[in-house]
């Protein structure tokens, strides 16, 4: 399955998300980036998808990942650009340029925080934005992306059926 790019989704995490579990746990919780990646891989697998998870503190690396997704023909992108969501026109332009279905994710509710976090450039390039659900937002994002791209799951393992 990993050889089929049309079954692959990229899960891209931006700056400081490597510090999950220790950075501001009152805001971001105690789950680590490894926990997030495990959740994404497990959720994607339920839909017959392969989640390829990456994290970078560097804007250009994230832009390169978006470009690579187009070249490889991946099915979709889950993006938590962290603070770059609020500042990066480069990420916005990259997402607009590749035309790959994208869901923006934020662990915290960015609209209930500082005013500078209320605006997201990357959200304008995504078909959906999910915030405030903790790391469960990644599961919700993959579920929504799977529906958007027509990936299906067996009802015995369907995470939405278990809710």
From Swiss-Prot:
PROSITE patterns: DEHYDROQUINASE_II
Protein's organism: Bradyrhizobium sp. (strain BTAi1 / ATCC BAA-1182)
Catalysed transformations (reactions): 3-dehydroquinate = 3-dehydroshikimate + H2O
Name of protein: 3-dehydroquinate dehydratase
Oligomeric and partner information: Homododecamer.
Enzyme class at the top of the EC tree: lyase
GO molecular function, one term: 3-dehydroquinate dehydratase activity
PANTHER family: CATABOLIC 3-DEHYDROQUINASE
